[in-house]
């Protein structure tokens, strides 16, 4: 009985922590009016953000607006937030692949929407919405991969930094073009980029806006692999690449991702406590007991 109560207490503590992590960065106390900016963005239609989930625990998000190089319209920004909400509630999920329709990743924001929200107040509202969404994407208890075909420009480059891994195809490129537009990243891309490549390389990528091709991205640590398959088969190749990282029970894979999130976002003492709590949710669990019975530690 004592063990059950202890495990239940750990589970509740973990649930509270996860709920806190899923909370948005911005709310009304920061001057963020989500309903107002969504109403504004809803005027700019076109494209879609499509979500599919499979029985093997892998979800796919497709940025689908190929006539505009998969740029985000206003309704697509809203849809992305809704898709992330869906994934937050998907208890069987282990992995996520984000890609763009028709062999290009994403070219950032659609200019029609950008021009219509050109004043600083509405621009900051859009910024807060997308930072909320991409931070929640990064915090999902899923191993996430951005599959980059063609171009990842501006906001598209920022989107790929919200994933755990980035796979690039031959001939693709990542480019932070914000400076050429008289801007800096606003969807959290700069902060995430520094964590990925370091401040020195991040400064070069943001101030010089170079075209980062696959080989260079590998050297920088911005990409994790270069896929060489055909355009038709590259999504399957990405699935094969992610499989070793999500093999096994979903609760264990999700626990691994959770300790990574806590280690990245919390101070050391809090991260250690969170790790202990998450450890308690899998210790003595079915997967742990089966592994002990099989003696699989060194196999």
UniProtKB/Swiss-Prot annotation:
GO CC, alphabetical: cytosol
Domain of life: Eukaryota
Gene: echdc1
Major place of residence: cytoplasm
Gene Ontology terms for molecular function: carboxy-lyase activity; methyl/ethyl malonyl-CoA decarboxylase activity
GO BP terms in the entry: fatty acid beta-oxidation
Subcellular location, record wording: Cytoplasm, Cytosol
Keywords in alphabetical order: Cytoplasm, Lyase
Transmembrane segments: none
Classification of source organism: Eukaryota, Metazoa, Chordata, Craniata, Vertebrata
Organism of origin: Xenopus laevis
Catalytic reaction equation(s): (2S)-ethylmalonyl-CoA + H(+) = butanoyl-CoA + CO2; (S)-methylmalonyl-CoA + H(+) = propanoyl-CoA + CO2; (2R)-ethylmalonyl-CoA + H(+) = butanoyl-CoA + CO2
Family: Belongs to the enoyl-CoA hydratase/isomerase family.
Full protein name: Ethylmalonyl-CoA decarboxylase
EC number: 4.1.1.94
Class of this enzyme: lyase
Task performed by this protein: Decarboxylates ethylmalonyl-CoA, a potentially toxic metabolite, to form butyryl-CoA, suggesting it might be involved in metabolite proofreading. Acts preferentially on (S)-ethylmalonyl-CoA but also has some activity on the (R)-isomer. Also has methylmalonyl-CoA decarboxylase activity at lower level.
């Amino acid at each position: 009985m004592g063990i059950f109560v202890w495990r239940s207490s750990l589970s509740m503590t973990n649930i509270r922590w996860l709920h806190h992590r899923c909370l948005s960065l911005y709310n009304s106390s920061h001057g963020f009016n989500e309903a107002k900016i969504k109403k504004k963005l809803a005027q700019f239609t076109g494209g879609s953000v499509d979500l599919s989930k499979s029985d093997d625990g892998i979800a796919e998000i497709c940025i689908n607006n190929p006539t505009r190089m998969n740029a985000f319209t206003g309704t697509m920004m809203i849809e992305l937030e809704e898709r992330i909400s869906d994934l937050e509630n998907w208890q069987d999920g282990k992995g996520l692949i984000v890609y763009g329709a028709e062999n290009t990743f994403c070219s950032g924001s659609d200019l029609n929407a950008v021009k219509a929200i050109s004043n600083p107040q509405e621009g900051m509202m859009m910024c807060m919405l997308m930072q909320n969404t991409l931070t929640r994407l990064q915090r999902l208890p899923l191993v996430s991969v951005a599959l980059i075909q063609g171009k990842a420009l501006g906001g598209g480059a920022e989107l790929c930094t919200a994933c755990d891994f980035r796979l690039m195809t031959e001939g693709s490129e990542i480019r932070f073009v914000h400076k050429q537009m008289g801007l800096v990243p606003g969807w959290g891309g700069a902060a995430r980029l520094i964590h990925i490549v370091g401040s020195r390389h991040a400064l070069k990528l943001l101030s010089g806006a170079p075209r980062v091709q696959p080989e260079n991205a590998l050297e920088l640590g911005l990409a994790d692999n270069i896929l060489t398959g055909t355009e038709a088969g590259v999504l399957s190749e990405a699935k094969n690449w992610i499989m070793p990282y999500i093999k096994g029970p979903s609760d264990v894979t999700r626990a691994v991702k959770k300790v990574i999130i806590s280690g990245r976002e919390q101070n050391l003492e809090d991260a250690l406590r969170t790790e202990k709590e998450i450890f308690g949710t899998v210790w003595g669990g079915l997967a742990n007991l089966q592994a002990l019975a099989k003696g699989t530690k060194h196999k």
